[in-house]
Amino acid sequence: MTGVQTCALPILALSPMMTHYLETKKQYPDCILFYRLGDFYEMFFEDAQTVSKELELTLTGKDCGLEERAPMCGVPYHAVEGYLSRLVQKGYKVAIAEQMEDPKQAKGLVKREVIRVVTPGTLTNSQVLEESKNNYLMGIVYIDGVFGVSTVDVSTGDYLVTEVRNERSLLDEIYKFSPSELICNEAFYMSGIDLEDLKVRLNAVISALENRFFSDDSCRRILREHFHVEHLEALGLADYETGAIAAGAVLQYLYETQKNTLEHLTRLTVYTTGQFMMLDTSTRRNLELTETLREKQKRGTLLWVLDKTKTAMGARMLRTLVEQPLISREEILRRQNAIEELNMNYISREELCEYLNPIYDLERLIGRISYRTANPRDLIAFGNSLAMLPYIKQILKEFSGELLKNLEAALDPLADLKELIDKAIVEEPPITVREGGIIKEGYHEEADRLRHAKTEGKDWLAQLEQSEREKTGIKNLKVKFNKVFGYYFEVTNSFKDLVPDYFIRKQTLTNAERYTTDRLKELEDIILGAEDKLVSLEYDLFCQVRDQIASEVNRIQSTARAIAMTDVLASLSVVATRYNYVKPHINEKGIIRIKNGRHPVVERMMGGEMFVANDTYLDNGKNRISIITGPNMAGKSTYMRQTALITLMAQIGSFVPADEADIGLCDRIFTRVGASDDLASGQSTFMVEMTEVANILRNATKNSLLILDEIGRGTSTFDGLSIAWAVVEYISNTKILGAKTLFATHYHELTELEGTLSGVNNYCIAVKEQGDDIVFLRKIVKGGADKSYGIQVAKLAGVPAPVIDRAKELVEELSDADITARAKEIAENGPGTQTRKKVAKPDEVDLQQMSIFDTVNEDDIIKEIMELEVNRMSPLDALNTLDKLQAKLKNRWMHQ
């Protein structure tokens, strides 16, 4: 079957139904159109070809008034959600055209309208959405250098807005929320941000909308109307002009695609990025907070360790808390105290977890109820969840801490809604809403009467069957039913001669005949009339119950949030007691003191093996920077990540893996750990490293924690050492930065900075030598390492013996003693005393003009070459000198 393009079809030649299909399709050109025909949603032309391929459906054809049949495929209406979700997850948008009237009662063409457009960011089907993760739609507006960012999860009702003023902060927000769909104005689309890269990294659909979505007046109006306020100041948007446009554009997009009142979007949360600890994309990735670097999975992350939640709502809230650590000491202490109180009341906590466990996803249930897509089983799940609330509320009353008391007060048992569901809905209803069997007996008088007529009708049929058997002598006479012929008598051919004259033939089969009578017709009208009326009435009654629940959306969402936070606190309490965590003291003096700290994830992954704990001490004075040396594989990276994770956990409000901990509030954590080429962006390992270092040096503050691992290793030894050295000098200077820093390096020459730069201290990983072999003790000790043990590590890794032996020979010849001696000289003389052109001390430099490297004059290099005593230089000296001169020239050319 050849592909027929809808744009090229002669409309006048088409059938009326197909003409309407194409008119509807024209209104939604970027969507696949699901067009309801009876019990199926059908697709035609190129949509059919696309869907049949994507969903592996049979492609057929339909007469459409043209010589060539229209390509067609379809899916059953009762199973549409699964097919919809599969298409949307592949990045398609789907418009659903529903029958708006009963085809039996329609005069002419059945009326059909698009009732909803389903997109990746507007999915509400809980069977498809990941329970523990939000499904976000994000709107971005770029106006006059300001990015307005609004994020919404229509499945839960979460709705947020903020503003950022640079591209890096914007990308951090995007990756933090990881939306499945992103809509934007044309200015953002053309701003130079690599949208193709964003699509790939997020696996998201990105669309630039028409300008009408971003009209200042219309965005403000739609927000005022939705939230029933006269001024946007009431929403906290007084100082968020661009943010308001983003929030309004998102709302208008939802109105147009969902064709729904969106009554479950009850509040707009306005936030600033400064309300929480800043974690850039690199830090989130390197610390593996919610997803591992390689496998992209939850197992092996901090979230995996902390997540002992019992509800989907709690799991999502915990993820949010991990990604947004607090910087408010008061709020941290409230969480800590709640966890401590739960720890001290073990039995009550276990009871709490027991009652939390059966609770369904209230946030997404009320979302579907508000959307009017919830089915009878959703209401039963909702009612069963409400049954747990009084018990949870009673347990929370036992606690005296501020946060737990607030949660108890916010938890509404919703007894009236529980009673409504118990009275109205049968305990095991069908999943569909239009086939009856939903409403309980005794709930509605007319429904009971129709149900009784339906039940009695079956008795009447049985009596009629028996009566006609006796009257006719047809022993196997039976009353049967099907949807085409209704009720009928079936008589086999062997008794055909006994059929009386008042039997009216309806159908002839191979082995039997089917008949009706006036009395059977009369009973059929009564019974089927009662059934049809009952099914219709039950649907109306179900909708009334659903509407009544939807009208209480504010109460339900408030309770859902209270349940989610209760679940999170219980989870953190379980983790604290199970893994022997301690309550950290939170200080505002900038001190980080950890006694016997442990890496929360590595400790759990090790199973029965003992984790070697380590101490950490950093402050804003004499202990700002720890230079950490030692061989690869010894545990430097684990130790540094451990310190960052303990700090982050403390600011979540969690207990931490240590014997003692005193954590100074950090405004940001930056990490530069590991190296990987960013091939998608065409950036090398070293370029990625330098970009991240530049970001850290430009955006860190004295209250930040920096985790820097092997800075400078992606280039030549001399360049790398120079960069690492300059970075330490820059960070150590309190007039410039003065941030608390863990700096791991294989450049032992950097240990010379201790005693010459304020706040720098040397630490190393203890190693025990046994002949040519080494044992990693995993212990951080004071002082610098005197060897890198690279050959021993290579031996442990299984490098062939001849290579190891040759390496031992070469290491004696290629000793870096000259480099070390020169480094010591530079350190003793201080920054800027080198024999080449003087480099100013960091505090003498205009920060706006400062660069890591200074440039050299070509005449200086020529003079240096002329003064060389070549005849007295060893081959190694000559090579070292040539390398230095080459590096200087490269640096000069880079700055031309």
Task: Specify the residue positions occupied by each region the protein language model found.
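Single conserved hydrophobic/aromatic residue that forms the stacking wall/gate
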Residues: 1-7
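Charged catalytic and DNA/RNA-contacting regions of genome-maintenance
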Residues: 8-341, 357, 361-370, 374-466, ...
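ATPase nucleotide-binding head domains, primarily ABC-like/P-loop NTPase cores
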Residues: 45-48, 240, 310, 321, ...
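Active-site phosphate-binding and catalytic loops of NTP-dependent enzymes
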Residues: 97, 120-129, 261, 397-403, ...
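Charged, surface-exposed helical/loop "interaction arms" that form contiguous linear patches used
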Residues: 371, 375, 385-388, 402, ...
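Extended, charged coiled-coil "arm/hinge" scaffolds of SMC/Rad50-like chromosome-maintenance ATPases
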Residues: 426, 509, 513-547
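C-terminal tails and terminal domains of large nucleic-acid-associated
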Residues: 851, 855-896
